[in-house]
From Swiss-Prot:
Designated name of the protein: Large ribosomal subunit protein mL64
Subunit record text: Component of the mitochondrial ribosome large subunit (39S) which comprises a 16S rRNA and about 50 distinct proteins. Interacts with GADD45A, GADD45B and GADD45G. Interacts with NR4A1 via the NR4A1 AB domain. Interacts with ATAD3A and ATAD3B.
Composition bias type Basic and acidic residues, residue spans: 186-202
Transmembrane segments: none
Pfam families: CR6_interact
Gene: Gadd45gip1
Subcellular location: Mitochondrion; Nucleus
A cellular component annotation (GO) from this entry: ribosome
Region: Disordered, residue numbers: 20-44, 186-228
Coiled coil: 98-207
């Protein structure tokens, strides 16, 4: 029984000893408001900028009222500021009529774009058969040109082999040089043939024009004779 009693007395002494120490902390009192408005020194460079603005003066008036010395008329926006606020309000908060008009314009523009796109598609679809025909014609002409070039190349190679002999390698420099010469000669002959055909066509056109002029002259002369 002695041990529990001793332990109880020790705990009581510990409680009595630690009690005052646990209550030694005292929180600081809440900050008091200034009884009068605080106006910063404008000449002091350490004064915060926000304390020199009209917003700070409005805050002092709202906190202290008339004793702040701020005229209530200065709290209202000026004419210029009011115009800026109205313009900003019209820009960011337009009226219902303005929004409806803007929506109508957007819908008209979208409808115009849709109609233009549909018209463009219709025009393209109308041109599609002719475009397909032109594409097929161009493809056929390219194929014919390739085949003609192959045949011309084969004829030139055959002619070169006839001149040099079939024992000459077609990949040799001598064979390729002769092939180039034959190609140049053939191109020259084709060019001369085209020029001759153009010249003959021009002469035929001039002769036809002269014959037509003479026929018109004879007709006019015959119509000018007096009838018997």
């Amino acid at each position: 029984m002695a041990a529990p009693a001793t332990r109880s007395r020790y705990l009581l002494r510990l409680t009595v000893t630690l009690g005052p120490r646990s209550r030694s902390y005292h929180a600081p009192p809440p900050p008091r408001r200034r009884p009068a408005p605080h106006w910063p020194d404008r000449e002091n460079l350490m004064t915060p900028r926000w304390q020199l603005t009209p917003r700070y003066a409005a805050k002092q008036f709202g906190r202290h009222g008339a004793i702040s010395g701020v005229p209530p008329a200065s709290l209202w926006p000026s004419s210029e500021q009011l115009c800026e606020l109205e313009a900003e309000e019209r820009e960011w908060y337009p009226s219902l009529a303005t929004m409806q008009e803007s929506l109508r314009v957007q819908q008209q523009a979208a409808e115009a774009r849709r109609q233009a796109r549909e018209q463009h598609i219709a025009e393209c679809m109308a041109k599609m058969p002719q475009m397909i025909e032109n594409w097929r014609k161009q493809k056929r002409e390219r194929w014919e040109k390739i085949q003609a070039d192959k045949e011309r190349r084969a004829r030139l190679q055959a002619e070169a082999q006839e001149q040099l002999g079939y024992h000459v390698d077609p990949r040799s420099a001598r064979f390729q040089e002769l092939l180039q010469d034959l190609d140049k000669q053939q191109r020259k002959r084709l060019k001369e043939e085209r020029q001759r055909q153009k010249k003959e066509a021009r002469i035929a056109a001039m002769a036809s024009a002269e014959g037509q002029d003479s026929a018109e002259a004879q007709d006019s002369a015959a119509s000018g004779k007096p009838s018997s």
